[in-house]
């Protein structure tokens, strides 16, 4: 299945193993999710936050909530 969401911002942890994507949905709402990748796993990034279903009216609201719930992101 193709992804329909457009990533507006992708923020990587300093070690490169984690990231948070802030995205825009086709309906105009925003969301975010946290992802992890392991160097030994050729499948790439996978969701570990499971925040992707939460809906925000603005990109700024999604960013603020991501910073609140993703510990490493709030420490950058």
Per-region residue spans from a language model:
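Negatively charged, low-complexity tracts enriched in Asp/Glu with abundant Ser/Thr
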Residues: 1-18
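Residue-level preference for alpha-helix termini and adjacent loops
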Residues: 7-10, 29, 55
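Aromatic-enriched hydrophobic runs in primary sequence
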Residues: 18-20, 30, 69, 74
């Amino acid at each position: 299945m193709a992804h329909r969401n457009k990533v507006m911002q992708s923020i990587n942890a300093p070690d490169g193993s984690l990231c948070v994507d802030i995205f825009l949905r086709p309906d105009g709402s925003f969301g975010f999710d946290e992802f992890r990748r392991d160097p030994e796993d050729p499948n790439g990034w996978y969701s570990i936050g499971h925040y992707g279903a939460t809906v925000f009216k603005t990109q700024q609201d999604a960013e603020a909530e991501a910073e609140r719930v993703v510990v490493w992101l709030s420490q950058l």
